Amino acid sequence: MTPNGHHFRTVIYNAAAVGNLQRIKVFTINSRNDRQWIIDCFNSDQDGRYPLVIAARNGHANVVEYLLEIGADPSVRGVVEFDNENIQGTPPLWAASAAGHIEIVKLLIEKANADVNQATNTRSTPLRGACYDGHLDIVKYLLEKGADPHIPNRHGHTCLMIASYRNKVGIVEELLKTGIDVNKKTERGNTALHDAAESGNVEVVKILLKHGSVLMKDIQGVDPLMGAALSGFLDVLNVLADQMPSGIHKRDALKLLGSTLLDKKMDAMSAMNCWKQSMEVPLHADDLRLVREMETFFEPQEVYEYQREAQNIAQVELLDGNIEAQRMQALVIRERILGGAHTDVHYYLRFRGAVYCDMGQMNRCYDLWKHALELQQKHFAPLYYGTITTLQSFHETFSMSLNDFVNNHHANRNLRVRSSWVKYVFNGVCLELERAAAWTGAPLLEDTECCGKERCQHATEESEYKKLVYVAVHLVNVLERLSLPSAHIDDSDEEKEPKADVRRLMIVCHELHIPLLHHTLEERIPDSNSAELGLPKAAVLEQLLELDLDVNATDKNNDTPMHILLRAREFRKSLVRALLVRGTWLFARNRHGDVVLNVMKRMKALNHANFDDLPLGRHITLAGLVANAMRVKYPKKFVGVEEQMPLELRRFYLAH
């Protein structure tokens, strides 16, 4: 009996990966005429590991030719690695095109009749793969064979856009010969001109303009001119500025470029030069009137230390030598030009705040991050990833700063965390959850930006709720620490009352069906970016339990809060005691059959925990014993008995 083709899959895959044709022939010589064996070995899925795909990726033309001869399917879609990323759903033709193996590309098309437009999971075609790394010969060949240059990937990004971004001049010119739409937009409103400008490719910019490219705004209101300024490319800016109808556009672009050079390139001298150049741009009467209006109606903000935007050369020169004023000027310019909804505005607010934090100026960090949070919650839908990241950063920074303040024996008063700050951020978390509960627009998280990987894993509402609850609970934990004498809290009434409105959190969690106690007692997996990963203080849990939260509520796995707590690497007897006092059912059983009391016994037997001073016997009830016996010892005798029970008793019985 001939062994199943699956049995040889791994050894043949490995041989194909390194181009060992002789080894492949040894294992296929007796089965090459067995169609089912060939299908099992070469054409059936096994974690995306197809011999033909890996041979095409690695450039082994002789292996590819042999595999095609014996019946390997040229349309299979596997997984290959490019630039340290796994590309999912990759056809052999895409792999060969992206890797630059034209001989294999010709083999697949001419001998195997491969589909020239067969795409990956992200809808990237072989032509786009070839454009990425500039394989001009393959691009020309694919176009000759009917490849469609108009097909975008899943984000609407076309072959012309990727070639423009990657500065592949020859490919850009070749694609333009096909009559491709030079002004086609992605889902986010980007054009090929955006990509060329933002990557500083002057020659490509000129070619696109020559072929009719128009300066259009994306969904954030940024045109290619502003894109060049945000990326720090003065030469591109000068080319594009000539396409604008008025001087005010170039003036603003130079201001924005100066802000980029200061914050991104750390080049204060060049930033000042750009700002001075912006004041020398010739303006028409209408432009001058607009500048005067901006100066007249501009409202300075406290967060920027009431600094006004410079509108003439004298005001710019006042900034010379004052680096703090320059930093605030960059933030003022960026928010005025880009608007409060632009992600760069939020990013640089957080960046500058982090710098102040590192300098020991927590109050400045808080003010800037608070402004960023307010803008994000004003302009974005609930659960926007940037908003959640800002809230997480607040929590982590508060925890680390408080640790430093206490560990350094209160030497640096600027590191002190104020309870009013923590309460504000806690209320911000509650507001984000309340916004989600009241949301009636498009499904949340639909506009989540791609993580940049070919196989993007977007967040879920449940995972984002969990993050927010975690932040809220640990902010309460920070407030508890601030109530200790070691925190040296201020004497003001506001600072003396470090209590959060946990009832507000409970209400919104109930509305969103979030298992608050479960998330509170779940220990997070450590990572390098988190300052605090442990369980909360017992006092925090007591605050929640005082709200009469159900300690026997179950989640989707039928876990009670006690089930979750007992899984923690750190055994916290104070938390276990608090749940027991509130009436945790010791015989509660989850979906996997784990009984709370049995878990405790196992932990004790393995010396993972000591329950000696916890009187577990006091918390064992007759009702629990009976329900456990009915469900475990005599399950067949009591089938369906719960249907005759009152609702509360039925819930109790089914939990055991």
Swiss-Prot record:
Recorded superkingdom: Eukaryota
Main localization, broad class: cytoplasm
Alphabetical list of SMART domains matching this protein: ANK
Per-repeat ranges for ANK: 47-76, 88-118, 122-151, 155-184, 188-217, 220-250, 557-588
Site (Cleavage): D320, G321
Outcome of substituting D133H: Locomotor defects due to neuronal dysfunction. Difficulty performing omega bends but no defects in reversals. Does not affect fertility
Involved pathway(s): Protein modification; protein ubiquitination
Keywords, in A-Z order: ANK repeat, Cytoplasm, Developmental protein, Differentiation, Phosphoprotein, Repeat, Sexual differentiation, TPR repeat, Ubl conjugation pathway
Subcellular location: Cytoplasm
GO molecular function, one term: protein phosphatase binding
Repeat in keyword set: yes
Sequence ranges of the TPR repeats: 346-379
Alphabetized Pfam families for the sequence: Ank, Ank_2
Quaternary context: Component of a complex containing fem-1, fem-2 and fem-3. Interacts with fem-2 (via N-terminus) and fem-3. Component of the CBC(fem-1) E3 ubiquitin-protein ligase complex, at least composed of cul-2, elc-1, tra-1, fem-1, fem-2 and fem-3; mediates the ubiquitination and subsequent proteasomal degradation of tra-1. Interacts with cul-2. Interacts with tra-1. Interacts (via VHL-box motif) with elc-1. Interacts with sel-10. Interacts with ced-4.
Family indicated by similarity: Belongs to the fem-1 family.
Protein name (Swiss-Prot/TrEMBL): Sex-determining protein fem-1
